[in-house]
Amino acid sequence: MGLSDGEWQLVLNVWGKVEADVPSHGQEVLISLFKGHPETLEKFDKFKHLKSEDEMKASEELKKHGVTVLTALGGILKKKGHHEAELKPLAQSHATKHKIPVKYLEFISDAIVHVLQKKHPGDFGADAQGAMKKALELFRNDMAAKYKELGFQG
């Protein structure tokens, strides 16, 4: 299920575009997640009061959390699948503290792909999309394995 060097290069090329403006990408990813899957909002005490897209766009806390999410994911993607050290604390917190189901990781993966398609159509063609989907699936599968080790059936 691993990615080829070429696929990792496609992933990291488009991720460079994300890193050029992490706050707006993170905000758009979370808004896309919450609009597409409103049930995910219930996992975020800080955001569950945000009902409209305008309220979400105006929230500095939401923007800050988007930066946190995409910064952590970027660190994992740059490891090209060798992300054990980065994944362990993330899985620990998401399984034991936040209780985030693996399904929600799939939802946010879809939101990431959607935002990248929208913001970077010229740099995120079919090959890059396929590579990113594979990289995010690898991340989710490894998170699910860690969840299982921790006894979380998310």
UniProtKB/Swiss-Prot annotation:
<keyword id="KW-0349">Heme</keyword>
<keyword id="KW-0514">Muscle protein</keyword>
<dbReference type="InterPro" id="IPR009050">
    <property type="entry name" value="Globin-like_sf"/>
</dbReference>
<comment type="subunit">
    <text>Monomeric.</text>
</comment>
<dbReference type="GO" id="GO:0020037">
    <property type="term" value="F:heme binding"/>
</dbReference>
<dbReference type="GO" id="GO:0098809">
    <property type="term" value="F:nitrite reductase activity"/>
</dbReference>
<keyword id="KW-0561">Oxygen transport</keyword>
<dbReference type="GO" id="GO:0016528">
    <property type="term" value="C:sarcoplasm"/>
</dbReference>
<protein>
    <recommendedName>
        <fullName>Myoglobin</fullName>
        <ecNumber>1.7.-.-</ecNumber>
        <ecNumber>1.11.1.-</ecNumber>
    </recommendedName>
</protein>
<dbReference type="GO" id="GO:0005344">
    <property type="term" value="F:oxygen carrier activity"/>
</dbReference>
<dbReference type="GO" id="GO:0019825">
    <property type="term" value="F:oxygen binding"/>
</dbReference>
<dbReference type="InterPro" id="IPR000971">
    <property type="entry name" value="Globin"/>
</dbReference>
<keyword id="KW-0560">Oxidoreductase</keyword>
<feature type="binding site">
    <location>
        <position position="65"/>
    </location>
    <ligand>
        <name>O2</name>
    </ligand>
</feature>
<feature type="binding site">
    <location>
        <position position="65"/>
    </location>
    <ligand>
        <name>nitrite</name>
    </ligand>
</feature>
<dbReference type="Pfam" id="PF00042">
    <property type="entry name" value="Globin"/>
</dbReference>
<feature type="domain" description="Globin">
    <location>
        <begin position="2"/>
        <end position="148"/>
    </location>
</feature>
<keyword id="KW-0963">Cytoplasm</keyword>
<dbReference type="GO" id="GO:0019430">
    <property type="term" value="P:removal of superoxide radicals"/>
</dbReference>
<dbReference type="GO" id="GO:0070062">
    <property type="term" value="C:extracellular exosome"/>
</dbReference>
<keyword id="KW-0597">Phosphoprotein</keyword>
<dbReference type="GO" id="GO:0046872">
    <property type="term" value="F:metal ion binding"/>
</dbReference>
<feature type="modified residue" description="Phosphothreonine">
    <location>
        <position position="68"/>
    </location>
</feature>
<keyword id="KW-0479">Metal-binding</keyword>
<feature type="binding site" description="proximal binding residue">
    <location>
        <position position="94"/>
    </location>
    <ligand>
        <name>heme b</name>
    </ligand>
</feature>
<comment type="similarity">
    <text>Belongs to the globin family.</text>
</comment>
<feature type="modified residue" description="Phosphoserine">
    <location>
        <position position="4"/>
    </location>
</feature>
<keyword id="KW-0408">Iron</keyword>
<keyword id="KW-0813">Transport</keyword>
<dbReference type="InterPro" id="IPR002335">
    <property type="entry name" value="Myoglobin"/>
</dbReference>
<comment type="function">
    <text>Monomeric heme protein which primary function is to store oxygen and facilitate its diffusion within muscle tissues. Reversibly binds oxygen through a pentacoordinated heme iron and enables its timely and efficient release as needed during periods of heightened demand. Depending on the oxidative conditions of tissues and cells, and in addition to its ability to bind oxygen, it also has a nitrite reductase activity whereby it regulates the production of bioactive nitric oxide.</text>
</comment>
<dbReference type="GO" id="GO:0004601">
    <property type="term" value="F:peroxidase activity"/>
</dbReference>
